[in-house]
Amino acid sequence: MGDDGKKNGAEGGLVKVDPKPTNGFSSKVIDLLEKLLVKFLYDSSLPHHYLTGNFGPVTETPPTKDLPVKGHLPDCLNGEFVRVGPNPKFAPVAGYHWFDGDGMIHGLRIKDGKATYVSRFVETSRLKQEEYFGRSKFMKIGDLKGLFGLLMVNIHMLRTKLKVLDLSYGGGTTNTALVYHHGKLLALSEADKPYAIKVFEDGDLQTLGMLDYDKRLGHSFTAHPKVDPFTGEMFSFGYAHTPPYITYRVISKDGYMHDPVPITISDPIMMHDFAITENYAVFMDLPLIFRPKEMVKNKTLIFSFDSTKKARFGVLPRYAKDEQHIRWFELPNCFIFHNANAWEEEDEVVLITCRLQNPKLDNVGGTVQEKLENFSNELYEMRFNMKTGEASQKKLSASTVDFPRVNENYTGRKQRYVYGTTLDSIAKVTGIIKFDLHAEPDHGKEKLEVGGNVQGLYDLGPGKFGSEAVYIPRVPGIESEEDDGYLVLFVHDENAGKSFVHVIDAKTMSADPVAVVELPNRVPYGFHAFFVTEEQLQEQAKL
């Protein structure tokens, strides 16, 4: 990439987020109306499970250096391990869903065996406006149930129509995931555009602005774009409640976003993830459908799952200019939050994914029980034959597995190992599991344990819970063994009330961690993690 590409990509497309909310008479009248609705229609006795314990929010922490390290931090971990998650700055007016919290990034800067911890809010338009008012103002997923939900939607529409809230920079939380592309760390949530984050030498994090790719991005942007490690391109999509329900995008290694490719499907769905191979993009038309009428009628969330519909998978040549050559495949009804990887094998496209039989987003609402008896997320292999048009699937694990990660040097190419989290609820990670896709699963096992295709299981132990683990190779590229590296994750000890970062040997999955870093503050449970290498940190520092 020449200097011109760097210059244009760095300056073009980064928008300073400067919303203009108004706090006049209209604002006060709507606040009063909202207060009355909450008083008469909301059951305030309902507990906010996802605001208690280690789900509860924390304040920002500036860089805190020279943390206690038990063991050693290998040189390949020089860089910054970051994880984002929901952390509401202001108390909710009524309901609260785990997905509602403001995005906060927790970072561990590692350099020459030493560790520094930092946590910073992503300075979104939404957060800036609520800071201006000093209270919660934006609509929450946790409110979107029944008649009360419909009325709260109208309150939100009134606030935007009367310019109490300014949606010209979107209204997302940016609390879901992180990716690095074209010299920028991007913080993501699927209801908004990406926010660019600068990582400083001391580990500190600063929100630079919103990325709109020189006004070429006019729709939402998935929290799970895919970066091809061989070409440097990034592949993405957005979903919407109005047609086109899915829009596919390709971004060059130089940061140029190509023209949109609309994908035609029958219903407005939630599509949280997708996949790429060397030549294809894989879309998932799964029946978690946006149905506001059912929200009012059945007192459910605004997305409802239709168990009568098949799961559809669309395979599109990844550089297609339109959807003309997309091939659709059907499999039994399911939902998928997260894919591990995909690749091509002879006439087939292979997808490794975490398949969920019964998605109930209510389970991550405010009143959920601690354990989820029916949350059965299992590792699956799905195959789509491009020659015959047939689809098949094979179960690879018992329940419950999520947040699958691979050595990302193999993104879109055949790989052997998958690392996932074991869960005792939708949010409580009890350990890290390693699958060997070359081995056959042991279907006699009803729970996740070593044997068959389960090559290792790192159990966090009683009262200790984690979040997504990121694989970091010891050597860049694919010349060394695929599992020659480390897994890094945040861990919270509920008994001691302390948080840590664990570093695990990804090859041996030894119960003895390579390193444990004690953190100065509690780190709440969150969503997706990422590792910014030392090379990337130095590259983005030039912007």
From Swiss-Prot:
Residues that hold Fe cation according to the record: 224, 272, 338, 528
A GO cellular component annotation in the UniProt record: chloroplast stroma
Keyword Iron applies: yes
Cofactor needs: Fe(2+)
Keyword Oxidoreductase in annotation: yes
EC number(s) stated in the UniProt entry for this protein: 1.14.99.n4
Reactions catalysed, as given in the entry: all-trans-zeaxanthin + 2 O2 = 4,9-dimethyldodeca-2,4,6,8,10-pentaenedial + 2 (3R)-hydroxy-beta-ionone
GO BP terms, alphabetized: carotene catabolic process
Keywords: Dioxygenase, Iron, Metal-binding, Oxidoreductase
EC top class, as a word: oxidoreductase
Stimuli inducing this protein: Constitutively expressed in embryos.
Gene Ontology MF, one: carotenoid dioxygenase activity
Pfam families: RPE65 (PF03055)
Family annotation (InterPro entries): Carotenoid_Oase
Cofactor binding, per record: Binds 1 Fe(2+) ion per subunit.
Assembly: Homodimer.
Chain's role: Cleaves a variety of carotenoids at the 9-10 and 9'-10' double bonds. Probably not involved in abscisic acid biosynthesis.
Similarity annotation: Belongs to the carotenoid oxygenase family.
Descriptive protein name: Carotenoid 9,10(9',10')-cleavage dioxygenase 1
